[in-house]
């Protein structure tokens, strides 16, 4: 059994070698010749999986180590009798922590408290729900917009997108990309929406580039609209609008979900799905794969305020470390993908062990996802 895996999927070689012969290949472009005798293909979001790639090939199963699936023609795979699995929620925590890192940086730079801001969350799936929970743990007001869930009658106080635009100081997008249909998200943030945002609002896109109309956004910024922008995703990736990058406050190369934990979850989820598909079901404990974190433990004295939270968050991950490298190489062919391929190891907040002498601080840090314990001062 021959299994092709994206060379940038951590732990893929070791895990899938339990099931067959493994060959690691580039994800963009996939070397087509390798598909001629392969039984399974494991990809990431950079690989377009459709009939033109797999038609006439012996592939029996495709796995994508990503939460999103808009790069996969699922209808064609089903018609062709090819098994398929994604990894829903695998990088949700990573994206939430990316958003927090960005907001805490902007709050420090611009001198505001997040408690004084209302956050509108567009898309309340794996990422949006976790983001809501962590924001509300901090006492920050959230407004939710998710028309598919609202129409299904899912639990939640869902508002219209117009309401979020009217009332939110921060608008963050966490939707799939739907190019048509009743829940179309292509250019959901169009010129009209962008112009309607509150003065001084913060716009964040960490889902799919085309959810925000990049041309319209650049037009508004060039005209001097007072708006802070965080973009991790771009229309036309791996190409991006260099002029837009110059205008945004934070720009990164589609790495919001790139924690070691998130990548490992993605790999293990598709590994488990494929093992079940071939009748040799196996399960993997994530903590058996992950290395020891960089920081063993730290001690926190007193209550948890915003500056302290910012220091803890940025100790684990400071978004500026990914903004600067992109600005240096933007516009140079191939460099966007190179930044992603050679991405520095990044951990999640759970990797940081925090000893608190304040019980409320320990409790709150645990709710936020840190590995925190309370040890009273003596």
From Swiss-Prot:
Q: Which NCBIfam families match?
A: PRK00257.1, PRK15438.1
Give a Gene Ontology cellular component term annotated to this protein. cytosol
Xref: InterPro entries: D-isomer_2_OHA_DH_cat_dom, D-isomer_DH_CS, D-isomer_DH_CS1, D-isomer_DH_NAD-bd, Erythronate-4-P_DHase, Erythronate-4-P_DHase_dimer, NAD(P)-bd_dom_sf, PdxB_dimer_sf
**Pfam families recorded for this chain?**
2-Hacid_dh, 2-Hacid_dh_C, DUF3410
Protein purpose: Catalyzes the oxidation of erythronate-4-phosphate to 3-hydroxy-2-oxo-4-phosphonooxybutanoate.
* Molecular function terms, GO-annotated: 4-phosphoerythronate dehydrogenase activity; NAD binding; protein dimerization activity
Q: Which organism is it from?
A: Escherichia coli O17:K52:H18 (strain UMN026 / ExPEC)
Keyword Oxidoreductase part of the UniProt annotation:
yes
How does this chain assemble?
A: Homodimer.
Q: Which Gene3D superfamilies match?
A: 3.30.1370.170, NAD(P)-binding Rossmann-like Domain (3.40.50.720)
Q: Which domain of life is it from?
A: Bacteria
Q: What's an example Gene Ontology biological process for this entry? A: pyridoxine biosynthetic process
Reaction(s) this enzyme catalyzes, per UniProt: 4-phospho-D-erythronate + NAD(+) = (R)-3-hydroxy-2-oxo-4-phosphooxybutanoate + NADH + H(+)
What positions constitute the catalytic site?
208, 237, 254 (proton donor)
Family, similarity comment? Belongs to the D-isomer specific 2-hydroxyacid dehydrogenase family. PdxB subfamily.
Q: What EC number(s) has UniProt assigned to this enzyme? A: 1.1.1.290
Q: What class of enzyme is it?
A: oxidoreductase
Going by the UniProt record, its keywords in alphabetical order are:
Cytoplasm, NAD, Oxidoreductase, Pyridoxine biosynthesis
Name the chain's protein: Erythronate-4-phosphate dehydrogenase
């Amino acid at each position: 059994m021959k299994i092709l895996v994206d060379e940038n999927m951590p732990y893929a070689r070791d895990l899938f070698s339990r099931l067959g012969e493994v060959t690691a290949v580039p994800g963009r472009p996939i070397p087509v010749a390798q598909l001629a005798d392969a039984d399974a293909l494991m990809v990431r979001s950079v690989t377009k999986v459709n009939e033109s790639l797999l038609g006439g090939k012996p592939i029996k199963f495709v796995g994508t180590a990503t939460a999103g699936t808009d790069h996969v023609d699922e209808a064609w795979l089903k018609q062709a009798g090819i098994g398929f699995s994604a990894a829903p929620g695998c990088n949700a925590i990573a994206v939430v922590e990316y958003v927090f890192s960005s907001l805490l940086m902007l709050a420090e730079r611009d001198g505001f408290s997040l408690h004084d801001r209302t956050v509108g969350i567009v898309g309340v799936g794996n990422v949006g729900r976790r983001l809501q929970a962590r924001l509300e743990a901090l006492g920050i007001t959230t407004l939710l917009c998710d028309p598919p869930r609202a129409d299904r009658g899912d639990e939640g106080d869902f508002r219209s997108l117009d309401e979020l635009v009217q009332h939110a100081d921060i608008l963050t997008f966490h939707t799939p990309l739907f190019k048509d249909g009743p829940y179309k998200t292509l250019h959901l943030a169009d010129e009209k929406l962008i112009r309607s945002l509150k003065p001084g609002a913060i716009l964040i896109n960490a889902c799919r580039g085309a959810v925000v109309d990049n041309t319209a956004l650049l037009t508004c910024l060039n005209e001097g609209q007072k708006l802070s922008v965080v973009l991790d995703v771009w229309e036309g990736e791996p190409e991006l609008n260099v002029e837009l990058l110059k205008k945004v406050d934070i720009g990164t190369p589609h790495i919001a979900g790139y924690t070691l934990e998130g990548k490992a979850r993605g790999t293990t989820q598709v590994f488990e799905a494929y093992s079940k598909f071939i009748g040799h079901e196996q399960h993997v404990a994530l903590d058996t794969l992950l290395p020891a974190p960089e920081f063993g433990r730290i001690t926190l004295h007193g209550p948890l305020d915003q500056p302290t939270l910012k220091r803890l968050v940025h100790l684990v991950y400071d978004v500026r470390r990914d903004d600067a490298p992109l600005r240096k190489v933007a516009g140079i062919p191939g460099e966007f993908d190179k930044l992603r391929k050679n991405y520095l190891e990044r951990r999640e907040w759970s990797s940081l062990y925090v000893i608190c002498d304040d019980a409320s601080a320990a409790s709150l840090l645990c709710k936020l996802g840190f590995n925190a314990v309370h040890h009273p001062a003596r």
